[in-house]
Amino acid sequence: MLQGGLLMENMSLAQSIEKLGADFPNLHWDFQEHRIGNRTELISQWLGDPDEDIMVCAFKGKEIHEKFHRQDFFFLNYAYSGAYGAQSDRFDHHVTIQENECYIGQPFSGYALHGSGEKDIVIIGVLIRKEIFYRTFLQTISADRRLLHFFLDPKINSYSDEFIHLTDLKDGAIRTQVELMATEYA
């Protein structure tokens, strides 16, 4: 009986990832051009509905190649299955995010995701509007000076370019949270 229950949970999660993956191309992909110094940058606007403060999305496919862009929100991209690359604006930095690792970005940090493989790449994204993040989560992270700097820097520097690459997430806590969020959001 327990195995059947676990199987149903996994089916529900698999169905949620399928739904979010199918919805991904139809999100509000609104890129606006902004002048930054002597160059023009693409800025992705909020991908969710106007009344949403936090949203979950998922890319599922064998190949992803995004245009280099910035975004007006915090994001956490979790490599649920497979690996992908992220090209960061910071020092023309490239980082590979392996399965069970996270790439966390600030508002307006420039980046582009890319990857391809024989099997599907699944990236689950959690997007959080800046205002809600500052109002809700800031107190929680205030004890860690580095994290506090990472999340506060965009309030001072509109075009901050920091990212966090979380590796060695062996305990599964983030994976479990991302799975729950994907299932509930779908």
Regions found by a protein language model. Name each.
Residues 38-41, 48, 58, 82, ...:
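Generic, low-specificity signal for short hydrophobic/alpha-helical stretches with a mild N-terminal bias
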